[in-house]
Amino acid sequence: MLSQIQRFGGAMFTPVLLFPFAGIVVGLAILLQNPMFVGESLTDPNSLFAQIVHIIEEGGWTVFRNMPLIFAVGLPIGLAKQAQGRACLAVMVSFLTWNYFINAMGMTWGSYFGVDFTQDAVAGSGLTMMAGIKTLDTSIIGAIIISGIVTALHNRLFDKKLPVFLGIFQGTSYVVIIAFLVMIPCAWLTLLGWPKVQMGIESLQAFLRSAGALGVWVYTFLERILIPTGLHHFIYGQFIFGPAAVEGGIQMYWAQHLQEFSLSAEPLKSLFPEGGFALHGNSKIFGAVGISLAMYFTAAPENRVKVAGLLIPATLTAMLVGITEPLEFTFLFISPLLFAVHAVLAASMSTVMYLFGVVGNMGGGLID
């Protein structure tokens, strides 16, 4: 069992290695679009500099916007017993097939499943765009499950001998054919169960709003612990960008009333208590350093230079722009238990700050 867990962790580490460079590109691009750093003239949308930076930034988002697909394809590299390249191909085709089935079933029988597939795939909708397919947002959890199923089929069926007249379907084609049939009930079960999980998360909003400091703790804890599932969007999305806390979302409300807050002699917490739900970014700034140092000093001495090369860009990305996936996914696969401890500490940090009267729009990194 331990060896299988280690193999799984090693397989998941392959896509994680793609995050640091992508994070650096996005972080630098965001910096270069900030007028405080480069001046107003260079950040003008009509300037050649701003246009080039925007193009580079879009390329940098590739890994982050396609995380489920990348994790799905990355799993067979470590878990397929043979023909890893062919296993990756089978997983990619099957994962996309699963999402197409979800889309088709959702569009056809959406009312039965309680999912509105006609709405836009935005944060809080429960939907996402995956390789151009509107589908349920199951994040890397769905990707890992489907990839694991197809990889298991590959390990069992890739070498299976078929009759001579069916020889053209032997190998990868046979795996994909069987996986095609398996993806139908998988898509059905996903549509049947996942929206209920999403609705359960949404129902927490009323409790979070009315629970004061406890609500801030639970909010921040769930926002961190649910990152691997994609369900964290249901936690922060409606608070930061939607009307769960204030009309228009905390981010817009903060920008609109910032001058009013600065002129008032009242404590900021009494003026804007809802700002306690936007303190989760502080763990990205301060917690990232602790996570990185822990991984560095627990690494074997001969590997510390390599580990530092991975951790430094990931940590800077988390601290500056609040993109924590490169660091937290590495952390998650190394020690899931400590990732849960990290979520507890992040929640406790936000709650203590809130109790001391600190509120505001602090959901991102230092630049935010």
From Swiss-Prot:
Residue intervals on the Cytoplasmic side: 33-59, 108-129, 195-198, 246-276, 328
Listed GO CC annotations: plasma membrane
Alphabetical keyword list: Cell inner membrane, Cell membrane, Membrane, Phosphotransferase system, Sugar transport, Transmembrane, Transmembrane helix, Transport
Entry keyword RNA-binding: no
Location(s), subcellular: Cell inner membrane
Membrane topology category: Multi-pass membrane protein
Broad class of the protein's primary localization: membrane
PTS EIIC type-1 domain: residues covered: 1-368
Pfam families in the cross-refs: PTS_EIIC
Biological-process GO terms, alphabetical: carbohydrate transport; phosphoenolpyruvate-dependent sugar phosphotransferase system
TM ranges: 12-32, 60-80, 87-107, 130-150, 174-194, 199-221, 225-245, 277-297, 307-327, 329-349
Domain of life: Bacteria
UniProt entry tagged with the keyword Transmembrane helix: yes
Spans within the Periplasmic topological domain: 1-11, 81-86, 151-173, 222-224, 298-306, 350-368
Gene Ontology molecular function, alphabetical: protein-N(PI)-phosphohistidine-sugar phosphotransferase activity; protein-phosphocysteine-sugar phosphotransferase activity
Domain note: The EIIC domain forms the PTS system translocation channel and contains the specific substrate-binding site.
Physiological role: The phosphoenolpyruvate-dependent sugar phosphotransferase system (PTS), a major carbohydrate active -transport system, catalyzes the phosphorylation of incoming sugar substrates concomitant with their translocation across the cell membrane. This operon may be cryptic in wild-type K12 strains.
Additional remark text: Is shorter than orthologs at the C-terminus by about 170 amino acids.
Name this polypeptide is given: Phosphotransferase IIC component GlvC
Gene: glvC
